[in-house]
């Protein structure tokens, strides 16, 4: 064995061992070491986010402009197909703002979960070669999703200002609350599903179907008032209760209440129809508080499950 090889072996022997996947502590106490580990690799997290954003638009002539094109295309489709053809816009004032607000927040939620679910498998080469906190990969998907959300939110704000609908009221505080809750639930599910997807590859396809169902089960292209009215007309108020079991229902409603001023006012439509304020849940604040507590608990559990499962990632992928 050469002198150079011996020196290299001796140098490696002096390096400390890094634990990969061995969860330290219990349900709560194990969180602190994980957070410290992630914080110690924050520079790498920044690089992963930048890499993901660059890879998404690599060799594209328009680049980041596609961040605008896709949501604007979806807005146009839903505005004309659902709003004008199916008539949903007749009972929803400023329908374009209403739809785009829902699409913007849902886009964040969808991207965090979908990107997080496949993040471990997408970085299989790196995981096999070096040790890094595996949580960095779902977090990088979150960072990329937040960037795209910020771009779309700027467009939404511009539209609100141009149409003279900027909500100068305390309702504006619902916007950051809704965004934070979306991040909490998206990250919790993204962490959990990214770990499970390593062992059960069908999970990523089930997630696509589930997100599609949840999209139509959320007040995005139709109003919450429509659900309330239809349920009341049939004497089936339990439908509203069932509808609100989807956490994104109340979160999207909070976001709409903050950014969609017309929904909180009595509005006269172009045909003379007077539309009353939208029936936001009277206990929305309390429901958001409950969602915050439940979401943090889910995030805690998701991280511990992730820590349990990550030990065999390198072998499984």
Task: Outline where the language-model segments fall.
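Hydrophobic transmembrane alpha-helices and immediately adjacent juxtamembrane helices
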Residues: 1-317
């Amino acid at each position: 064995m050469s002198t150079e090889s011996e020196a290299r072996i001796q140098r490696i022997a002096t390096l400390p061992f890094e634990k990969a996947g061995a969860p330290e502590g219990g349900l709560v106490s194990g969180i602190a070491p994980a957070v410290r580990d992630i914080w110690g690799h924050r520079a790498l997290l920044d690089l992963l986010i930048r890499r993901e954003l660059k890879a998404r638009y690599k060799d594209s002539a328009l680049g980041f402009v596609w961040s605008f094109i896709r949501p604007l295309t979806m807005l146009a489709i839903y505005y004309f197909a659902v709003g004008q053809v199916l008539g949903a816009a007749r009972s929803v004032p400023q329908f374009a703002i209403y739809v785009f607000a829902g699409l913007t927040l849902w886009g964040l939620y969808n991207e965090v979960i979908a990107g997080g679910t496949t993040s471990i498998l997408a970085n299989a080469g790196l995981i096999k070669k070096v040790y890094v906190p595996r949580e960095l990969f779902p977090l990088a998907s979150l960072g990329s999703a937040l960037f795209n959300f910020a771009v779309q939110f700027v467009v939404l704000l511009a539209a609100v200002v141009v149409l003279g609908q900027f909500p100068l009221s305390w309702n504006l505080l619902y916007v950051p609350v809704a965004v934070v809750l979306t991040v909490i639930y998206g990250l919790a599910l993204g962490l959990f599903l990214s770990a499970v997807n390593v062992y059960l590859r069908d999970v990523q396809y089930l997630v696509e179907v589930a997100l599609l169902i949840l999209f139509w089960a959320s007040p995005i292209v139709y109003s919450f008032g429509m659900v309330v009215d239809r349920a009341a007309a049939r004497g089936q108020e339990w439908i509203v209760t069932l509808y609100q079991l989807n956490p994104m229902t109340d979160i999207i409603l909070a976001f709409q209440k903050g950014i969609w001023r017309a929904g909180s006012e009595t509005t006269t439509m172009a045909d003379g129809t007077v539309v009353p304020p939208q029936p936001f849940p009277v206990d929305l604040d309390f429901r958001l508080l409950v969602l915050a507590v439940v979401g943090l608990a889910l995030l805690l559990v998701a991280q511990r499950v992730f820590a349990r499962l990550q030990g065999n990632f390198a072998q499984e992928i």
